[in-house]
Amino acid sequence: PSFMDLVEKHFNESITFGNELKPDYVLDQAASQASGDNTNPQVNFAQADALLKYCGENQIPVRGHTLVWHSQTPDWFFKENFSDDGDWVDKDTMLKRMENYIKNVMEGLATQYPDVEFYAWDVVNEAWLDDGNPRKAGSSKSEDSNSSAWVRIFGDNSFIEYAFQYARKYAPKNCKLYYNDFNEYMPGKTTAIYNMAMELKEKGLIDGIGMQSHLDVGFPTASTYRKAIDKFASTGLDIQVTELDITTSD
């Protein structure tokens, strides 16, 4: 059998694109500037087209990954006139951009790829540091990987709730919405994710937590990992292992 035959036989329940639906693959700078609307970023699915068509033709559901992330999100998305050298926009402008971006992604996919079922979306990805604090104010070009342009604009992690509000508003009816993160078993991060998830759950905005689970045979211990799972499960939300890999020290 061919490689694709094996995919269709053994991995036909779900596919997550590694990069093709991330902001820097989907956002279209030239079209955004040409639109004349400073609050309406345009999107283009050209780089995801082959995968989307494949999933539609083979009836393989897709987990959307990801909408709001500090990484692989171009700085021009946060700047005046969608320009690389523009000034950083204010919070109100960025909220409008966030809503229109999520709207354009959801509606564009539904219109252009009606045969593709998006059963889930990672709405926000990796917003908390290991100690449970928000990322630092920065940009996608910062040498500090702990920095975020979202935090630069909003001052904190308040953008998370807005992202889930807009995703809930525009996502397909039965699509589940997730928060996704790595090192989710670090105590400070576990607590931050738990508290955030409970607040979002009370408002009906979140359906589950994605545990990336980039593990090593030496860390975390099984009991540490289990403790995080139990903590997240106590929210009553769906818990999914989303990016599992286990490395060895040798």
Set out the residue ranges of the language-model regions.
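Glycine-enriched alpha-helix->loop->beta-strand junction motifs that scaffold or abut catalytic
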Residues: 11-15, 205-206, 235-238
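Charged helix-capping and loop-helix junction motifs
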Residues: 44-47, 192-195, 221-228
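Substrate-binding cleft and catalytic face of glycoside hydrolase catalytic domains
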Residues: 13-31, 37-178, 182-184, 248
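Substrate-binding surface in catalytic domains of secreted glycosidases
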Residues: 135-144, 214-228, 232, 245-249
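Short amphipathic alpha-helical segments and helix-helix/interface helices
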Residues: 4, 49-52, 164, 197, ...
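Active-site clefts of carbohydrate-active enzymes
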Residues: 175-186, 211-217, 232-250
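Short, acidic/polar
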Residues: 2-10, 98-108, 187-200, 225
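Active-site glycine- and acidic-residue-rich loops that bind
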Residues: 155-158, 185-193, 215-223
